[in-house]
Amino acid sequence: MKTYRIKPEEVERKWWVVDATGKTLGRLASEIAKILRGKHKPYYQPDVDCGDFVIVINAEKIRVTGKKLEQKKYYWHSRYPGGLKERTLKWMLENKPEEVIRLAVKRMLPKNRLGHRMLKKLKVYRGPEHPHQAQKPQPLEVKA
């Protein structure tokens, strides 16, 4: 008996909506990454993108534990001499809360083309409104 291998065109994709109000950042991000990879499906294969679409609303109401608001820093470089930039988590949550969740999930996905395709299925919004009502997203309860 041969092992069944699913083809990318056979994958059924659903849309999920997650409310981030009061949820812990890391726990929420790991659940979202699991859905984006497709690990919740019985036919999961690591080399096939079989994940679903995830919409995150109320990103500005995310919660973090400990002293991370002041101590956690995000770094990037402009590729110019002396171009190392840094921002604290507190600044990021005030100005770009969508980016905080997107980066947390991105760092939990594979670092290759497949991971890039998975990240494109993540939609993060600051408030409770999103433009994806036509896809009929189902609410996903995350215990985070």
Curated annotation (Swiss-Prot):
The keyword Glycosyltransferase does not apply. Keywords: Ribonucleoprotein, Ribosomal protein. It holds the Pfam family Ribosomal_L13. It comes from the Bacteria. One of its GO terms (cellular component) is cytosolic large ribosomal subunit. GO terms for molecular function: mRNA binding; structural constituent of ribosome. Residues 125-144 are annotated as: Disordered. One of its GO terms (biological process) is negative regulation of translation. Coiled coil: none annotated. NCBIfam families: rplM_bact (TIGR01066). This protein is one of the early assembly proteins of the 50S ribosomal subunit, although it is not seen to bind rRNA by itself. It is important during the early stages of 50S assembly. Part of the 50S ribosomal subunit. HAMAP family: Ribosomal_uL13. Belongs to the universal ribosomal protein uL13 family. This is Large ribosomal subunit protein uL13. The gene is rplM.
